[in-house]
């Protein structure tokens, strides 16, 4: 799935407006609000927020606040958040996944990116202003026009990252305003008994067959890293939910699409303290954690809400706490004396988790074989049913989930399926709903970006297809996206190279003709954990590539108002076999679904690219074919064989991307690793 670093392009508003009919100005449409009329016009989808805003402002008065900031995250800086943390959605009525709300004594404003502008106009009432420039700087600029000198801006420190706190604090202080940390969330006070409760599903241990190492081995590894660190920390604080889940091989279902549970861990050189809801652990799980003893390999369970007090108590001694600043909230950071902090971008657990051992690699590969069966079944089913006019984006998304549900060890989807036909596919993160969707047609391209959570691995794959006659431009764009996928996948590069250095290889074929895409090229992926697993990937802030990492490779192209293309595979970083000695790496693709032959212009492929593609198709036949045969899926096996027939060159390629690509891309990026 393409990561949400899509630029805020104004044309996306027009696309959304066109998606289900001819474009109209916002003032003429009945599905969005019009706050310029008297009385204001509100669609039936708009939420009346007057009562909650009045109550919130009363709470602000008790704290002497001029403004209150409401972000869209949780105390663990999670990408996906649970219902009980949907504070920004509840106060605004806007349920999109990205946005920051600010409430002052007289005004309320929401900042969100271009993916959600139309949705916000449909869901918010006229109590709210919509702002389209999303950054701390723009929010602070607005605040300075709305609150007086000396004004106090409140925030929940558990919902701010350390970097977010610092950026707001510096900007407001420079303008003689004050950023005030308030540990009791004011929205929660207003939400009251209507706020969804914290989840209470059982927290369970993964079966040994699905764990790469025992939790005792992992704890010993992290303690060893503590001892080797030059600052000799006495403890590691784990705040990200996947860190604790990975460390103890524990899972649950608190977060949509992610098998996590609300938790923290304080791992010291002599104790293990797990902060969670104690009532959710069965006697078997407690025994698994050795919770009834007091040695250094016994897990002491403490209440989730006690983490801040426990950190304060621990730091009263002669200690040092090692934190990863990217996922530690300011609410914990502010109570740790600075001389007792050891700070890195990512915790040792986050770094260790990113490199899969041989057992974890085998598990992830196995999950991708079964996932390929489900996706191939779906594509074969579409090929037969789309011409009948009976399939739409929403029913298609449900159908692919049904196919995955028949696979062994399936636990659920790994994110909301992106099932997009025609112009909707030009929206990189579009997902259909039961109410709003388009029919799939043989006359249009169709993009499917989907994935599954299995006990042995997490999957994420994107394929774009066309069942009719694609235009020459569609074929060229598709083929250039495919070339980018191939050239990055087959790249050989020095060990410890940053992903951002090689990212241009996925774009070069598009750049050659003036095309590009606005989202990230790839992200890490976990073993029954996050579908977007940091810190692996091709962006700034990602750690250097290392053998054993898994990453997606997903170039794309999006033609405004017409179609979208994305081709995404998951790949394992492996050691490359080179002619001369040296430590070099390359990628081994583990996604196993063929591309659409109808959309490939073979004349654009170099001999090396064509050879790679045919070898990939042979690998699909060898790894997925026997599974289809074993299960008696003969129709799907026939489909697979047809779609993986070797391709042959029809014309000489107009240019070779080999050495030219290497020289130009590295010159652009300065080859700084």
Curated annotation (Swiss-Prot):
InterPro entries: Creatin/AminoP/Spt16_N (IPR029149), Creatinase/aminopeptidase-like (IPR036005), Creatinase_N (IPR000587), Pept_M24 (IPR000994), Pept_M24B (IPR033740), Peptidase_M24_C (IPR032416), Peptidase_M24B_aminopep-P_CS (IPR001131), X-Pro_aminopeptidase_P (IPR050422)
Cofactor requirement: Zn(2+)
Ligand binding (substrate): 115, 429, 523, 532, 554
Enzyme class: hydrolase
Pfam families named in the record: Creatinase_N, Creatinase_N_2, Peptidase_M24, Peptidase_M24_C
The organism's place on the tree of life at top rank: Eukaryota
Tissue: Kidney.
The family this protein is said to belong to: Belongs to the peptidase M24B family.
Name listed for the protein in its UniProt record: Xaa-Pro aminopeptidase 2
Gene symbol of the encoding locus: XPNPEP2
